Amino acid sequence: MLVNTKARVGVFAIALGAYLPQFPSLVPEFEAQYADFKKRIPDSVELIDGGIVTTKELACAAGDKFRAADVDLVILQLLTYATSYNMLPAVCDLDVPVVLVNLQKKAAPDYANTDTATWLGELYACGAVGEMVADLERAGKRHAVITGVVEGGDPEADAEIADWCRAAQVRRRFRDTNLAQIGRPYPGMMDLYIDETNLYHRMFLYTKQFDWEKMWAIADDVTDEDAIRAKAQDILDTFDIEGGGTIEKVWDMAKYVVAFEQWVKDEQLGFVASHYDGFAQGVAGKLDSMLIPAFSMLIKQGTACAVEGDIKVAMAMSILKTISGMGQLSEMYSIDFPEDICIIGHSGSGDADISKAKKPTMKIVPVFHGKTGGGYLTQFYPAPGPVTYLGITQDRDGHFKFVVAEGVNEPGPIFTFGDTNMRTRFTCGARDFCNRWSEAGPTHHMAAASGRWIDTILKVAKIFNVPVDVITR
């Protein structure tokens, strides 16, 4: 990533304080369990430790810590039964989900030889889960439950914890980076239009506006020939260029990529949405002709770059890039009715990390269809297998909504005129998919990632408090 971000996850554990003087052996038992539990939290996030809470005062102290850190998620370990006042003061001032983790130490009771202390310390983590959820509901807090076991290991529970932490990374990325809008959306594509103040209010994402005149001059001061040469080689390593590629052939493009990378770092950019509708010539025309591969190099490094000024699909691309490692701009492209296949793809910048079937290609075209000018197009080749699509839209009141679907990319003929396109089969069939997806009212762009990611997207949506339409999976 050109701009790195790290989610902050508040972690604490609760137990009923009245048990501890009655059964002193529970103190070291719970301390050991909590220390072990914290090791289950992935190193990819920053752990904000609220400690073991057995009183309201300790809960308040944990809450102060979480609030000061601006945590993206709270994970609560239930050690044994505890009353909900051990929990609520820690989360009452937060607007993030609380994940209740009920991990029982022993896989099964030794019924004949279990005393009260052993039951409370090793077999009673499930005792208060329902109570916690009931009070989180009444407090208007979002929540989730993970149930599992420590003895013998529990990959399913560990995977759920890791998935929640992965989803939390999205919130941190939206809060800690900015979105650059260069120019304005494609004229008349009203589904793309957006209120940037509402965007900041609801999704924590701040928009910085840039004029094309500034972008045209962005590489004027780039003189480090070693950096340009290294970036030119990176471009050649990323793309097969029609007619052959050389360092000299992509030198100017590499110069712009070096400049754009520094711009992304200076402005803390996680997202770029751009569109140009002029008749650029000279230096401006040169940049316009090579902008698609230049932005593709940024996408590869974690900055979502969307064509046609589509901020919403830039967000979708970033979400998928953050949780899956890839985020490819797409749209409904065509339908192969005899094969019952949807052709999904788009022209413009894309993500080399999705191109597992073949090395991405770059070619020059005389005209960008529907736009002014011509230049380089890039095409990416997702491998056959599961694929996830994510669209983002808004209702009449400005609330955001996610639209998601899972399908399977199948091998077969694709278009070869320079645009990325995939042959996707959906369980509901191509006709019904097109109807259902369209009826959900997404923008006409979507993001794509190889793999099945709906479960993680549902967690992201809960973190942002955004509804989700699941079309098919």
Per-segment meaning from a language model:
Residues 296-416:
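C-terminal catalytic subdomain
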Residues 230-323:
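Long, internal scaffold/assembly segments composed of regular secondary structure
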Residues 370-473:
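Extended hydrophobic packing segments that form well-structured cores
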Residues 2, 6-9, 107-232, 236-239:
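Cap/lid and interdomain-hinge subdomains that line or gate substrate/regulatory clefts
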Residues 59-71, 88-90, 257-266:
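Short, well-structured alpha-helical segments in soluble
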Residues 1-35:
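N-terminal basic/disordered segments at the start of proteins
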Residues 31-55, 142-148, 205-211:
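Short beta-strand elements in bilobed, periplasmic/extracellular small-molecule ligand-binding domains
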Residues 89-115, 120-128, 293-308:
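Short, acidic/small-residue loops that bind anionic groups at enzyme active sites
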